[in-house]
Amino acid sequence: TDNIYWIALGVDSPILRYHMENNQLEESFPVKGRATELSIINVQDLKAIGPYIWMGTRAAGLYRYHTQTHELKHFGSEEKSPEQFLPSNHVSTLYTDASENLWIGTYGGGIGLYNNIKESFTIYNEENGLPNNAINSIVADNNGKLWVSTLKGMSCFDPKSETFTNWDNKNGYSLLETNLHACLKSSSNIFYVGGNNHFLSFNPQLIRRNTFIPPVYITKMRIWADYLEDNKAAQWVNISNQRIKLRYNQTSFTIKFSALSYVFASNNKFSYMLEGFDKGWS
């Protein structure tokens, strides 16, 4: 801000201000109200938005410092008002998008989107489709979608539809675990992501989702009444007909089914319902 660089050195170290014009480094600066508190926090990430410096800490939540009035405001997961909750006090990464929205990545709580007008947060976590609540980095592509690296794969978040699309080692994402802040977008919209086994690169515009829904067929059936009558193990019977007639006492049976596609078959999810017995799809 104004040719001033803010530097966070980590554990037990102060936040520094470096002035480009006179080549001076400051270890202290005016703070109203919480100066002692600011001197002991472990800052993980810094972001500047307008007159504010945002500081994400490892265990003390989020701080906002006004560079003109020198006021310091704290946001934490223990705030009394629910809408002021951070998803976690362990802030791992901060990101500002093209509209200067502040996105807060945490370890254990997912993502928080800060509303500057209401001074509140919208939380996105595993319940909303995020693959994991431990966030290592957040970076937007040229279309405004956020690419979020977690401890269990990469996720693409569409802010307009508020939906997640996830990638892991089951559908082509080869990193076992990403590293903190190890995500970079180049000027040509190429992403580079670093992990504990290697790093990878990809172009979001070239990724195509597999939207094909394969047909599902019942392939085998085992009727337990046969086991009770014949005093022998019930055998699996291959199913080739569209309709099967059962006797009145053949009320207990097991079926096997399959989706006829080998494209990332482990990602297929199934729902089932027995008409006349179940009230809805499971």
What are these regions (language model features)?
Residues A35-N42, E79-S92, T122, E126-V139, ...:
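Residue-level "micro-hotspots" composed of small/polar
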Residues T1-D2, K47-P51, T96-S99, A140-G144, ...:
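Residue-level detector of Asp-centered blade-edge/turn motifs that repeat once per structural unit
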